Amino acid sequence: MSLLDYFKSKKKPSTAVMAKERLQIIVAHQRGQRDTPDYFPQMKQEIIAVIRKYVHISDDQVSVQLDQNDDNLSVLELNVTLPDR
């Protein structure tokens, strides 16, 4: 019987726990986007447009992030996955 008890004892996390975890992820994501300037989405699209003049890429091959430090310093990070020739 102990073998059957082993399989019965596994419980799924409650819906409240799952909802709490999802909410924490959403809140963390929104906090990260709150500090971005208003011009950032347009700047990102313009950067992608310039890259597309020279290389055929899709939007998911470009990652643009703006990190702000406590020292009033902003860092723009751009990662582009280039296709093979």
From Swiss-Prot:
User: Could you confirm whether the keyword Zinc appears in this record?
Assistant: no
A Pfam family per the record: MinE
**Residues making up the signal peptide according to the UniProt record:** none
Q: Which domain of life is it from?
A: Bacteria
- Provide the GO biological process annotations: cell division; regulation of division septum assembly
Question: InterPro entries, alphabetically?
Answer: MinE, MinE_sf
Q: Which Gene3D superfamilies match?
A: Cell division topological specificity factor MinE
SUPFAM superfamilies registered for this protein in UniProt:
Cell division protein MinE topological specificity domain
UniProt keyword list: Cell cycle, Cell division
Which HAMAP family would you find in this protein's record?
MinE (MF_00262)
Similarity remark:
Belongs to the MinE family.
Q: What is this protein for, i.e. what is its function?
A: Prevents the cell division inhibition by proteins MinC and MinD at internal division sites while permitting inhibition at polar sites. This ensures cell division at the proper site by restricting the formation of a division septum at the midpoint of the long axis of the cell.
- Name of protein: Cell division topological specificity factor
Question: Which species expresses this protein natively?
Answer: Shewanella sp. (strain ANA-3)
